[in-house]
Design a protein with these regions (language model features):
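Glycine-rich cofactor phosphate-binding loops and adjacent beta1-alpha1 units
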Residues: 182-184, 225-327, 370, 393-396
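N-terminal Rossmann-fold NAD(P) dinucleotide-binding loop
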Residues: 199-200
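Glycine-rich beta-strand-centered segment in the early N-terminal region that forms part
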Residues: 23-45, 54-105, 110, 132-133, ...
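Conserved S-adenosyl-L-methionine
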Residues: 208-213
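Conserved acidic E/D residue at the C-terminus of a beta-strand in Rossmann-like folds
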Residues: 218
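NAD(P)H dinucleotide-binding glycine-rich loop of Rossmann-like/cofactor-binding domains
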Residues: 98-193
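C-terminal hydrophobic helical "lid"/dimerization subdomain
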Residues: 1-2, 10, 30, 34-35, ...
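Short glycine-centered segments of the SAM/dcSAM-binding site in methyltransferase folds
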Residues: 89, 189, 292, 329
Length: 396
């Protein structure tokens, strides 16, 4: 049996590359899954949601194999897999979804009802998401292959565009979903809170959807420069001033049509103090009456590192009366990746969006993953793509 290595969370602030079991066609509860496949991982990315766990801001246990952004080549298929074949190059949505339950049939694959005994929704390599082993590894098992996997039509073309296509597993559909949920359309003015990879992906998606002005706010100057590099207006929160005043300066009016929260529960206010509700409250302040707010930023039910007891259980101090008075619609939750990934794949393959350039992908080896985590945590304006087998280096 081949060997396997993966990125393992070992405690707050620590990840290591370790030898792990080679995957089998077995689910986390020990049941044989003939609907699954084994992938040789071609690309797997470090995500901001992984950082929440690594910072000790969740109940993730040491020993958890990280990674939910997985692209790979099929090397083994279960006996009931009919459509996906050995040798196919595929993108795996970060959601684990059965394709059979009510939610999956209604395209709400982010909250599949069967893949996680604890609650609706599953994901690879993530705490409380069903125990599915993560894909920041050389090899990984993907269940429900015929339903879940997106096959690339031309392997050679896909390898040439892999730094773009690897973003289909999470951040591009997530940013796009945030914008669609916020009602972004032709001519919209859009405020994106957060200039990390998801925020940058949301900004790129907003342009794809036809936004006239896309504004990105953050404290990180390097990430704001990255946003500006593909046409975004920016608000540097480290320089002070109210969001309202900044919008007035940029747009001539103190509000936007649509807003997207790409920050989540580790939001900070001026001075660096955590204030988990600050982004949501600011977005309600500046979104026009009858506007919509997309919230792909992660909010959790358990945060052991929160500053107060309420926030430790996901209870936030929201100015909800303002949102009600302005007839806002707020949309939250895991992105149903399968709703968008094929269309976004076609946009990439036909050069309608250059997401790798927008998020500034940086390819690293599996052994360099711990340093990638450290650099990302320091605010690097990059999207780290792990290349476990050197496949992307060979294709370059």
């Amino acid at each position: 049996m081949p060997s396997n290595r993966g990125v393992v969370y070992t405690g707050p602030g620590k990840v290591e590359v370790r030898s792990i079991d080679f995957p089998k066609l077995v689910d986390p509860r020990g049941k044989k899954v003939e609907h699954g496949v084994i992938l040789k991982v071609v690309a797997t990315n470090i995500c901001g949601s992984d950082q929440h766990m690594v910072r000790g801001r969740t109940t993730a246990p040491p020993g958890l194999v990280l990674g939910h952004e997985i692209t790979g080549e099929v090397i083994e298929a279960g006996r009931t897999v009919e459509v996906i074949k050995v040798g196919d190059l595929v993108s795996a949505p970060f959601n684990v979804a059965c394709g059979r339950c009510r939610n999956c049939r209604e395209r709400n694959t982010g909250v599949c009802l069967t893949v996680n005994p604890g609650r609706a929704g599953g994901a690879y390599g993530y705490v409380d998401m069903g125990g599915w082993i993560g894909g920041q590894a050389e090899y990984v098992m993907i269940p429900y292959a015929d339903f879940q996997l997106l096959k690339f039509p031309d392997k050679a073309q896909a390898m040439e565009k892999m730094q773009d296509l690897t973003c289909l597993t999470d951040i591009l559909p997530t940013g796009y979903h945030g914008c669609v949920s916020a009602g972004v359309t032709t001519g919209s003015t859009v405020l994106i809170s957060g200039a990390g990879p998801v925020g940058l992906a949301a900004a790129a998606a907003a342009f794809l959807l036809g936004a006239s002005v896309v504004i990105v706010s953050d404290f990180n100057g390097q990430r704001l420069a990255q946003a500006a590099s593909f046409g975004c207006e920016t608000i540097d929160l480290s320089k002070g001033g109210s969001i309202v005043d900044h919008l007035e300066r940029i747009l001539g009016v103190p509000e936007v049509d649509c807003a997207v929260d790409c920050v989540g529960f580790e939001a900070k206010q001026q001075g660096g103090e955590e204030q988990p509700s600050i982004v949501l409250n600011e977005l309600m302040t500046v979104t026009r009456a009858a506007g919509r707010i997309g919230i792909p930023g992660l909010y959790v039910t358990q945060d052991p590192g929160a500053k107060d007891e309420a926030a430790k259980t996901g209870n936030l101090s929201l100015h909800f009366g303002l949102g009600w008075a302005k007839s806002h619609a707020l949309f939250t939750g895991q992105t149903p990746v399968m709703k968008y990934n094929r269309g976004l794949m076609m946009a990439i393959l036909h050069d309608r969006i250059h997401i790798a350039k927008a998020v500034n992908t940086a390819v690293i080896s599996l052994d360099a993953a711990p340093q990638g985590y450290a650099d990302f945590d320091k605010g690097a304006a990059k999207k780290f793509v792990i290349d476990p087998h050197g496949s992307l280096t060979k294709a370059a």
